[in-house]
Amino acid sequence: MKLAILSRNSKLYSTRRLVEVARMRGHTVRILDPLRCYMRIVVGDFSMHYKGKPIDGYHAVIPRIGVSVTHYAAAVLRQFELMGTYSPNPSDAILRSRDKLRAHQLLAAQGIDMPMTVFGDNPDDTQDLLSMLGPPPHVVKLNEGAQGKGVILSEKNSASRGLVEALRGLYANFLVQEFISEADSADLRCFVVGNQVVATMRRQAAEGDFRSNLHLGGSATAATASEEEQEVAVRSAHALGLTVAGVDLIRSRRGPLVLEVNPTPGLEGIEATSGTNVAIKIVRHVEEMLATICSSNICKP
């Protein structure tokens, strides 16, 4: 298999692990910085260049796309798709999952529960918007944030109004959600590959914080997701069109609630905590999907 990995940094743990495993399994692998890819769009002739040279013939591409380059990198990934290259996470699925509002709407439409969420635009509606949500504490989130950045806990209604007004003044898109106190500032990261959860870890927020992200000082321990939690995680990934995803859940009195579905979840924390070789499961999944596609006589490269 000729495999491309879209990544801005070849030294990142997740990128290195995927390259290592793919080469160990006999595949030809190249890391491509999506911002150095550029394309020509012509009816019947989609092409791509990288650092001055044409690139084609890739059987599969694994996207490791950061939030800051989502839209351009998704366009690059879409061009690969139009050239007949398979991706476990298609460009449209990445765009769906990176837009928290859109993702929440799609998940709710599939009957997947999450913290109650409100969204609005006009300052005149702020008080009624918060009334729809219920009493504080409230969680205010930037719509396209990541790794816990842009997530604020507001313990008073007046503080929530102030935050909403400040974010509107910055022309930032945001959501406001109910705070689930019984989650005890912890969540589960369920790593979905294909039709199953292949690894799980429990993340606990650092003392004095409520965000459990490891990048913000949270700690992680090995965990086992219940059958219900695994089912919710897989359904959530598939509802957005993803086959590789990190699904973040919290445990509540009404069952598992989805916080976020990450289309490019990091491998370092989950592999170290769970002891599972997640990278090889991703590469094997790509191999299996390509075998299915090629057996259907639609394998183009």
Curated annotation (Swiss-Prot):
Record keywords: ATP-binding, Ligase, Magnesium, Manganese, Metal-binding, Nucleotide-binding, Protein biosynthesis
Pfam family, one: Rimk_N
Keyword Repeat (UniProt): no
A cellular component term, taken from the record's GO annotations: cytoplasm
Protein family according to the UniProt entry: Belongs to the RimK family.
Binding residues annotated for Mg(2+) 1, in chain numbering: 248, 260
Protein name per the record: Probable alpha-L-glutamate ligase
Start and end residues of each ATP-grasp domain: 104-287
GO molecular function, one term: metal ion binding
Details of cofactor binding: Binds 2 magnesium or manganese ions per subunit.
Record: residues binding Mg(2+) 2: 260, 262
Cofactor(s) needed by this chain: Mg(2+); Mn(2+)
Enzyme Commission no: 6.3.2.-
Binding site for Mn(2+) 1: 248, 260
Record has Ribonucleoprotein as a keyword: no
Biological process (GO), any one: SOS response
Residue positions binding Mn(2+) 2: 260, 262
Enzyme class name: ligase
Annotated PANTHER family: RIBOSOMAL PROTEIN BS6--L-GLUTAMATE LIGASE (PTHR21621:SF7), RIBOSOMAL PROTEIN S6 MODIFICATION PROTEIN (PTHR21621)
Source taxonomy: Bacteria, Pseudomonadati, Pseudomonadota, Gammaproteobacteria, Lysobacterales
Residues binding ATP, per UniProt: 141, 178-179, 187, 211-213
